[in-house]
């Protein structure tokens, strides 16, 4: 039943072509824009503090990503986020590398405190550090660490009063009450930079068109993971360069039937 709903949301994204405003990092800007276009959304990358408030209020969703943060982008994120909050636009936050440095951790916590976030998406270490728990970080990627990811997602969602998606070998998304685990995707995603960042923006596209934000987030995770599996069938053995191309193709060609056939989502207690 839920896979049927997810397939319908995929169709709706393409029908409505939502505008997703990204204040993201320099490493992933091109990949993020092309990924959103391939899916059927409309990306805009606007960073200047003089215009971000106006852009955010007309967007379907606002995505904030601190991968290559600096003081100018932080200011722009706060301006855009407050504008989005005032106009009912969902704000999604990707706390890239939270825990790697005090600057990243403090910035992540500040954004989470000062803005009304609809979603936070990160790996387990990033999410843990946003709520003040220590998980081991290497660069901006989390090592395998102890702790129950489902419990962490629930706790973070309750503490931050938002929907939290923790992605890894198994993806988990929770609003603090309802929790889903998603068992799609492919390991080669970790060999292409920006796949997590694009995922947050894809979640923005789904959040823009769905009333039930938790299901919207789960839908994005399932669709993204299924597209990765389809791309990996064609290119995983060739390498990450070919996979990146096939992944964009898979996002573009993904169907509701693919979702029903390959989607693997569980509701957790």
UniProtKB/Swiss-Prot annotation:
- Share an example GO biological-process annotation for this protein: thiamine biosynthetic process
Asked if DNA-binding is a keyword of the record, the answer is: no
Recorded E.C. number(s)? 2.7.1.50
- The signal peptide, as residue positions, is none
Q: Which cofactor does it need?
A: Mg(2+)
Annotated GO MF terms: ATP binding; hydroxyethylthiazole kinase activity; magnesium ion binding
- Kindly list the positions annotated as binding substrate: 45, 194
Q: Look up keyword Kinase and say if it applies.
A: yes
**The protein's enzyme class:** transferase
Entries under CDD domains matching the protein: THZ_kinase
Q: Which reaction does it catalyse?
A: 5-(2-hydroxyethyl)-4-methylthiazole + ATP = 4-methyl-5-(2-phosphooxyethyl)-thiazole + ADP + H(+)
Detail which positions bind ATP: 121, 167
Q: In which pathway does it act?
A: Cofactor biosynthesis; thiamine diphosphate biosynthesis; 4-methyl-5-(2-phosphoethyl)-thiazole from 5-(2-hydroxyethyl)-4-methylthiazole: step 1/1
Q: Which UniProt keywords apply?
A: ATP-binding, Kinase, Magnesium, Metal-binding, Nucleotide-binding, Thiamine biosynthesis, Transferase
Q: Which family does it belong to?
A: Belongs to the Thz kinase family.
Query: What does the function comment of this entry state?
Result: Catalyzes the phosphorylation of the hydroxyl group of 4-methyl-5-beta-hydroxyethylthiazole (THZ).
Q: What is this protein called?
A: Hydroxyethylthiazole kinase
Q: Which organism is it from?
A: Brevibacillus brevis (strain 47 / JCM 6285 / NBRC 100599)
């Amino acid at each position: 039943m839920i896979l049927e709903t997810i397939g319908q949301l995929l169709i709706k994204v393409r029908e409505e072509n939502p505008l997703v405003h990204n204040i993201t990092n320099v490493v992933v800007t091109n990949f993020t824009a092309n990924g959103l276009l391939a899916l059927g959304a409309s990306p805009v990358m606007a960073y200047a503090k003089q215009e971000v408030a106006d852009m955010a209020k007309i967007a379907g969703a606002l995505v904030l990503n601190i991968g290559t943060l600096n003081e100018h982008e932080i200011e722009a994120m706060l301006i855009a986020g407050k504008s989005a909050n005032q106009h009912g636009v969902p704000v999604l936050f990707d706390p890239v590398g939270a825990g790697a440095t005090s600057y990243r951790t403090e910035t992540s916590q500040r954004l989470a405190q000062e803005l009304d976030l609809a979603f936070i998406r990160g790996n387990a270490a990033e999410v843990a550090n946003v709520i003040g728990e220590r998980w081991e970080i290497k660069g901006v990627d989390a090592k395998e660490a102890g702790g129950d990811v489902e419990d962490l997602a629930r706790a973070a969602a309750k503490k931050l009063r938002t929907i939290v998606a923790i992605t890894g070998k198994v993806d988990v998304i929770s609003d603090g009450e309802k929790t889903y685990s998603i068992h799609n995707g492919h390991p080669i995603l970790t060999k292409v930079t920006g796949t997590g960042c694009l995922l947050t923006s894809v979640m923005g596209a789904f959040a823009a068109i769905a009333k039930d934000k938790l299901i919207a987030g789960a839908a994005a995770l399932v669709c993204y993971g299924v597209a990765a599996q389809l791309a990996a069938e064609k290119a995983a053995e060739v390498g990450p360069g070919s996979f990146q191309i096939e992944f964009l193709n898979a996002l573009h060609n993904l169907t509701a039937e693919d979702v029903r056939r390959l989607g693997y989502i569980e509701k957790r207690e």
